């Protein structure tokens, strides 16, 4: 009720500036400790698809296409494909973590409820989830960059410049995915995100 002394319009409105603190860091560490037990299977799963793209399309179709000309410079098709695979993997990894994994922690496992029994606010949890998803994306693309170096697809020092750019991609897509997460009633809702937004973004 507006006349009630406990009524606070600022708390009732969802449109407010986030109240952030350093308490997001223990939440981030918690996700890291849990994930560390599954790091190897997670890594293999994240790099399997782009690796198949590189082998099937890069070497297979690359033998037919040969080289592309970009800004007057010849570029091997596999290098062209690998660059897109890196961006696609960053988008996928950040989105998947901020959708399915974060939704499970929020609704299924009730992890967020347990964390909020400590002096940690919801804004700190959301920030930790966003940064964690971005970290997962950065970890994934680092592995793919390692594959590119191992297969001698590229040795350009510009690969180092890709890290901050891909971190920005991870933060951007994890933020958008968390918005969908907040609106979702179940896992099926995420199909709209992948079908109508993420997949067209790859092209």
Feature names for model-found ranges:
Residues 1-203:
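Hydrophobic transmembrane alpha-helices and immediately adjacent juxtamembrane helices
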């Amino acid at each position: 009720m507006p006349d009630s002394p406990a009524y606070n319009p600022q708390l009732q409105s969802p449109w407010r500036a986030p109240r952030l603190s350093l308490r997001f860091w223990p939440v981030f560490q918690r996700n890291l400790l849990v994930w560390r037990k599954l790091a190897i299977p997670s890594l293999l799963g994240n790099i399997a698809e782009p690796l198949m793209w590189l082998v099937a399309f890069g070497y297979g179709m690359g033998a037919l296409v040969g080289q592309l000309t970009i800004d007057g410079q010849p570029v091997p098709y596999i290098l062209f494909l690998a660059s897109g695979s890196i961006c696609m993997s960053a988008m996928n990894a950040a989105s998947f973590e901020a959708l399915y994994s974060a939704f499970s922690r929020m609704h299924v496992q009730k992890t967020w409820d347990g964390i909020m029994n400590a002096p940690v606010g919801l804004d700190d949890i959301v920030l930790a989830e966003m940064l964690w998803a971005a970290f997962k994306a950065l970890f994934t693309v680092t592995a793919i960059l390692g594959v590119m170096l191992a297969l001698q697809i590229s040795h350009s020092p510009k690969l180092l410049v890709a890290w901050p750019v891909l971190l920005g991609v991870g933060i951007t897509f994890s933020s958008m995915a968390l918005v969908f997460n907040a609106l979702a009633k179940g896992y099926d809702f995420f199909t709209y995100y992948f079908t109508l937004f993420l997949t067209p973004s790859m092209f």
